[in-house]
């Protein structure tokens, strides 16, 4: 990834983290526009959610992120493009001003990922397969298209 980046700390609950990874891998084979890296997939997920606008995001009715038990989640720092981070921050403001939705950055990304996971599951036509271990650095893609 080129250009300026800003480290962005996000809280992940283990279930959402695993589903995000599974959606990324499924999208590699079933979405011709899927980027070939998880970080780029996360960028696209955020940018698509921004593009829905505050009303579109509110209409989705995604259940808020819940902490199921203390100590289960974890923080990760993701190097986001400055433009993506700025768009995310503006979306947070728009959601609060236009719809009274007060979300943390992590909760907002959780919402974006939840929608991306559902779309990936729809493309696949079944539940997503969880990915054990580390994601591949340079994944082989199927002939999507």
Spans of model-derived segments:
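Short Lys/Arg-rich basic patches
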Residues: 1-24, 39, 58-92, 106, ...
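Short, basic amphipathic alpha-helical segments that act as recognition/interaction helices
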Residues: 30-60, 100-130
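Alpha-helix C-capping/helix-to-loop hinge sites
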Residues: 23-31, 91-99
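Conserved aromatic-histidine-acidic binding/catalytic patches
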Residues: 8, 34, 76, 97, ...
């Amino acid at each position: 990834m080129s250009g300026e980046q800003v480290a962005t700390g996000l809280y992940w609950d283990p279930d959402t983290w695993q589903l995000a990874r599974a959606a990324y891998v499924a999208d590699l084979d079933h979405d011709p526009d899927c980027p070939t890296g998880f970080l780029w997939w996360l960028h696209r997920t955020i940018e698509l959610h921004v593009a829905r606008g505050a009303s579109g995001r509110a209409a989705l009715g995604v259940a808020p992120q819940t902490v199921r038990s203390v100590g289960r989640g974890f923080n990760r720092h993701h190097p986001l493009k400055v433009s993506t981070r700025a768009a995310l921050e503006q979306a947070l403001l728009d959601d609060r001003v236009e719809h009274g939705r007060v979300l943390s950055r992590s909760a907002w990304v959780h919402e974006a990922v939840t929608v991306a996971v559902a779309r990936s599951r729809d493309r696949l036509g079944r539940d997503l397969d969880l990915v054990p271990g580390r994601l591949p650095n340079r994944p082989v893609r199927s002939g999507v298209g």
